[in-house]
Amino acid sequence: MERFSPKSYKNLTGIQQIIVLFNNFILPGNPWVKRLQKMNLSEEYLNKCQGIINKIREQQNQIQKAAEWFATSILSGRVVHVFGSGHSRIMVEEMWPRYGSFPGFNPIVELSLTYHNNVAGANGQRQAMYLENVSGLAERILRNFGLDKKDTALIVSSSGCNLVPIEMAELFQEKGIRVVALVTKEHLDKSKSKRTDGKKLTDFADLVLDSGAPAGDSMIKIDNLETPVSPGSTVGGIMIINSIKAELAKRLTDAGQPPKVLTAACVIGAEKAAAIFEAAYDEHAHRMAELYKNAGK
């Protein structure tokens, strides 16, 4: 900040004088300025999230295409395989099963890659981070299912650089299955792939969606704290998931196969909600039975 000095002040231009006066007299004592200086960090985070929303709005064509591909698979009696390791499992569970969602998905949640709530010790974070970079694990996971070209796949990975999601996308493509990758593009671009050939998840994707978060994911910088906090990829990822879900539900309904949407009893009544839950779970079981029936073929 330019410190006030009567002698030097005379030598400044008009605009420079205004800046010096503002910095030295108006800024320090103005309560409104002080309020801005102490801006609530939660408000700053929400502003960053608004920026993520804007980035997702720019991906309408990709969202529509993903919904169209998913609808084609579900209407043909097949499924959309959804996979994510680490925190990316959140997006898998957001797609199905939860309120506002419906059958047609194969949620692949491998506990060895995602159940690390203990952080340290048995089932800890170290093991999960190690396992998501074990080559060949993706093949072992997919060996459980009978895949079909009519399927589609959604692979979620913020960095797009870990081996298991990359190899899973590669295996799906080898089977002729279209792959949608949900990544954080800025983070992916600045990260190094764990594959020796340097290929990333997006190299095995037919369609790429961007969560809109920054490189490193965290969005808020705090004075005297070296590293930023409060990530944004989950916020963006969930908005993309539910945008696709809405478009997909419309397509299924327009095609004469309205989805069985898990709905709260407070919305449609306990009896009807229970009936829909049972019907939705049965449909899911029948679709999964087809996958298991043809495993290994």
Question: Which residues make up each language-model segment?
Answer:
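Conserved N-terminal alpha-helical segment that immediately precedes and caps sugar-phosphate-binding
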Residues: N23-N24, W32-K297
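Residue-level detector of alpha-helix boundary/anchor positions
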Residues: M1-E2, D197
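Short, low-complexity, charge-dense intrinsically disordered segments
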Residues: E2-W32
